[in-house]
C-alpha cells in the first residue's frame, strides 16, 4: 500500500493509516502481515513439542497436606461447602499437626469429632477440604431449640390431605449425591457445627447414623433406612464431650459417652501460630497493610503474648482469629476514613476486644500483657492541657 516493510505490519497500519489488520486484509486478502523470517523462527522453535489433551475430569489428583488425593471434578461446586475467605493450611505449631491428623481421618472417610477453642478453624478446615476436593457436603448448626427431626422430614398437607416430606439431610443420607454428567453416586459429608450445644435428645439422632456396623436413619413412622456407604459425619464443638470445664462455654452440654464412642476419631484443634496467621491477616486487610504495615508486627506480638497467658490459665478470656480480625478490622476502618494514620491506631483497634472483657480486673490484666508491644501503649487515656479526655475528634477524625 505504501511500500513500508517490517517484521509485523499491525503497528504501522494503525499509526500511519489508521487501519486495523482486519480492514487491511479485507482490502488485500493475500497480503502478508508477518515476515516470513518470523514464521520460520516460530516453526523451528516449536519442533518436537507435543500437545496432549487435559486429564480426564474423573482422574484428577492433587497434592494436599502431603497426600496425593483425588478431586471430584464432576461434582458441582455449589454442592460443596464454600471456601473460607483467604484460607490457608497452617505449617507452624500445634495447629499444623492437628490438621495433618484431621486430614488423614477426613480423607479416609472416618466419623470425626473436632473440638477446640473458639476461632481455631474447626469448621473452616472442613469447608476448605470440601471445596478443594469437590466433596459434596451440607452443614447444620445445633442450638438448644433446634428441631433436629425437621432436618430429616416434616409433616405437610395440601388439598389431598397430610403427608410426610423428606428434607435435605434425609435425602443426603439415604440417596447420596448424583454427579450431573457421570451419574456417579457419591456419599455426602455432613458437618454439624456446635454439636456440644445439643441436648441429650438432639444428640440421640446420630446414634443410628454413625453405628459402627451399618449406618441407618429412622424415617417417618419409625421405618429405618440404610445410609449411603461412605457417608461421613463430622461434628465440631468447643468442648470434648464432658461439658464446660473452663466456665467460658456455659451453653455446652455433656454428650452421652456411647455416642462419643461411635465417633471413630477425635481431634483437638489449637490456635494458629502468628507466622501462619500474619499472611492471612495481611490478605484480609490490604489497605491497613499498605498504610500501616508495622501495625501487624505490634498486633502479632500482642497475639502471641495473650494466647500464651490464656493457655497457662493466667488470663480468663479467649483471643481467637475472630478477635484478631476484629482488632485489625477496626484499624482498617479508621485508616479508610482518615487522611493521616493516627498515632494511637493500634490502641484504638485493641479497644474493640478489650471492651468485651467480663470485668475490669481481666481487662487490666489483658492490657498489661499487650502494653509493651503497642507503640502508643494501651493503658490510660491521653488528656489535653485542660485535663479533658483527648479523643479522636480532637485529632480531626
Please give the residue ranges for each predicted region.
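Active-site catalytic microenvironments for nucleophilic, acid-base chemistry
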Residues: 16, 132, 212, 330-334
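DNA-binding alpha-helical recognition surfaces that contact promoter or target DNA
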Residues: 11-15, 128, 326
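Short, surface-exposed acidic
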Residues: 21-26, 33-36, 288-299
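Cys/His-coordinated zinc-binding microdomains
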Residues: 3
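AAA+ P-loop NTPase catalytic core and its hallmark functional loops
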Residues: 49-294
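Alpha-helical lid/collar subdomain of P-loop NTPases
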Residues: 51-92, 100, 273-278, 282-397
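Short, basic alpha-helical nucleic acid-contact segments in DNA-binding proteins
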Residues: 28-49
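C-terminal recognition-helix end and immediately following basic linker
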Residues: 6-33
